[in-house]
Amino acid sequence: MSSAGKLPSEVERTLVRKSGAWTNPAYGCPPEKRPIHEYIEKGVVNIDKPRGPTSHEVAAWVKAILGVHTAGHAGSLDPKVTGLLPTLLGKATLAVPALRLSGKEYICHLKLHRAMPQKLVRQVCEEFTGPIYQMPPIKSAVKRVIRVRTIYHLEVLEIEGTSVLFRVGCEAGTYIRKLCHDIGLALGCGGHMQGLRRTKAGPFTEKTLITLHELKDAYVFWKEDGDESELRRVIRPMESAVSHLPKIILRDSAVDAICSGASLAVPGITGLDSNLAEGELTGLFTLKGELVALAKAKMTTEEILKASAGIAASPIRVLMEAGTYPRGWTKKEEKVQL
């Protein structure tokens, strides 16, 4: 299937098997079955950010509601912007960089400074797909140098007078306000961003959005009634935040070494993404689906499948605690098919 027009997180991925594998049910557990305290500390909430507060304020409220020590959001939204604000909790905050680098999608209200022919508006908007040059706004927190950002798709949804509603999928770090300004310049009439809502952030969509009130209610139900079902619904395992990354599946015997910071050798791999590239950020997972670490691939899929030795990946951030799996465990208890 073609990946044209898709966000990176929407490109279909498949796993290929390198060798047979077994996992011991006595160690680790599927992410969705973690004890509730661990589930929270290794969770992510897809908050529907309201208009008004800053992204940091929303993340602080999430932290206060759940009583976690840390909470970090993946990609800031201006106070007036609404929509998806995935917020990672506790240990899961180590995965924030992986989510921040994923593609984003927005619905934007562009206000033209005078009415223009609809055919021309659509034509000009189409020309803004692909790589574009952007200079960060004057009020930006980053250095003002020209940068290249990719627009994966830009679809005009509605035009009424000087109002243009469009959907845009873009690379992280794209300034939609600047995009609106540049479209106005290209049309020769000028324009500015009137409103903006984020509808996708990496693997997260509006289907799993929750409000701060829903999060608070779910927490109260658990604390007062002992009912954790609603809390498990509104909080997702941290693995969902990196589901867009290529995967490498580890043997049980390789897990603890990775947790201690060791590089991943080829014999420790049982399966992997079919299109892994050297240097690519990848997720290292157990056979039960637990995220062990984020790593940088040192070999391609083809090289790993052919190799019997060598370093396949080097951990960048370790998210699983050492001792979760025994070192060098080899006893065959239960087979898991890829």
Swiss-Prot record:
SMART domains: DKCLD, PUA. The active site is at D78 (nucleophile). Residues 245-320 form the PUA domain. The keyword Mitochondrion does not apply. Gene3D superfamilies: Pseudouridine synthase, PUA domain. It is an enzyme of class 5 (isomerase). Its EC number is 5.4.99.25. GO terms for molecular function: RNA binding; tRNA pseudouridine(55) synthase activity. It catalyses: uridine(55) in tRNA = pseudouridine(55) in tRNA. Pfam families: DKCLD, PUA, TruB_C_2, TruB_N. InterPro entries: Dyskerin-like, PsdUridine_synth_cat_dom_sf, PsdUridine_synth_N, PUA, PUA-like_sf, PUA_sf, tRNA_PsdUridine_synth_B_fam, TruB_arch. Keywords: Isomerase, tRNA processing. One of its GO terms (biological process) is mRNA pseudouridine synthesis. It comes from the Archaea. SUPFAM superfamilies: Pseudouridine synthase (SSF55120), PUA domain-like (SSF88697). Belongs to the pseudouridine synthase TruB family. Type 2 subfamily. Could be responsible for synthesis of pseudouridine from uracil-55 in the psi GC loop of transfer RNAs. This is Probable tRNA pseudouridine synthase B. The gene is truB.
